[in-house]
Amino acid sequence: MTLPDGLLLRGFVDRLDVAPDGALRVVDYKTGAVPREAFEGKALFQMKFYALVLWRTRGVVAAQLKLLYLKDGDALTYAPDEGELLRFERTLIAIWAAIERAVATGDFRPNKTRLCDWCDHQAFCPAWGGTPPPFPVEAAAAAGWPTLPIVEVG
């Protein structure tokens, strides 16, 4: 699906249930445990993405978004509405605009979080004092990618 600004959206839904009245339920299976309440919003980002695509392609707002966590058998469910999907669409467009600005300027600042403690790429990450490998200029040119300037992050 392509948004009005040209952003192409694509994803793979694990399961789409259709009720006799046509109501849709989007289901995604997760191998871990249900997240704490503080992290539910991040967990539902993917599901809102699917709901937006369904709404824009079928004209139907999913009645329910459901994440099923196989580790503990718990589920996280959510019922979006049209207004929220419009806000989410604007959020996606803003995120994409930020990515395009980063590509245009070469400014990809790392976002250091607690998850970084387990990352195998710390030696390459400026947030950890690492040095990224050189950009593969020849491969990028062959693929038609723009060459990006190097921006030091301090």
How should these model regions be labeled?
Residues 1-154:
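RecB-family 4Fe-4S metal-dependent nuclease core
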